[in-house]
């Protein structure tokens, strides 16, 4: 790889490839008599993966309500019924007068 890169650089500089090849062959190659220490055995540690939480809607992530398990949803009402609460009168309807038995 280095030789290829050097050839490209030499060609870009305008040097002849023959002169460049002569320079590279005269450099001594590293001897194989040197021994390298064996690389230490690496241990791979596995990460503990947590269970993925259940997916929630975006609004549910932001707004946490304290709701009871048995709380019922309120009845749906018309918009006018929400605005105008009716007042209940506590008057009982008048009873007809009792007729004496004849």
From Swiss-Prot:
Pfam families assigned: Asr (PF06392)
GO cellular component: outer membrane-bounded periplasmic space
Signal sequence, renumbered to the chain: 1-21
UniProt-annotated location(s): Periplasm
GO annotation, biological process: response to acidic pH
Induction, per UniProt: By high environmental acidity.
Keywords in alphabetical order: Periplasm, Signal
Keyword Signal: yes
Entry PTM: Proteolytic processing gives rise to the active protein.
Propiece residues: 22-58
UniProt cross-references to HAMAP family, sorted A to Z: Asr
Name under which the protein is recorded: Acid shock protein
Organism of derivation: Escherichia coli (strain K12)
Gene coding for it: asr
